[in-house]
């Protein structure tokens, strides 16, 4: 098993996960019952852990870390915009993302009031 040595920025980013979970909770609480919300957040936690692995291995030191930047990045989408070729050439992509993961991310964007049609990963990547 590979041991991950996180930088200070990455450690701070991991702590900021709570901000995202709290934000998701605020937006979903009024729309879903407690059971559905709990199940949704459990699935989201699994997906989000996968996202961090992908992000760390792909971007390393460039990971965003402050609360302000974190919130801004969240509002603008989870990932930096990349071209389709850049996305498909990532060695981690096939391991990290499944179609279910993609749909869950898309649903999170909808619940957070983001434009789901402007998501940089499109359905065509999964066809």
From Swiss-Prot:
Q: Which UniProt keywords apply?
A: Cell cycle, Cell division, Chloroplast, Plastid
What processes in GO biological process is this protein linked to? cell division
- Indicate where this protein resides in the cell: Plastid, Chloroplast
Q: Which domain of life is it from?
A: Eukaryota
Q: Show the GO cellular component annotation of the record.
A: chloroplast
Q: What does this protein do?
A: Prevents the cell division inhibition by proteins minC and minD at internal division sites while permitting inhibition at polar sites.
UniProt similarity note: Belongs to the MinE family.
- Its protein name is Putative cell division topological specificity factor
As recorded in Swiss-Prot or TrEMBL, the protein's gene is named minE
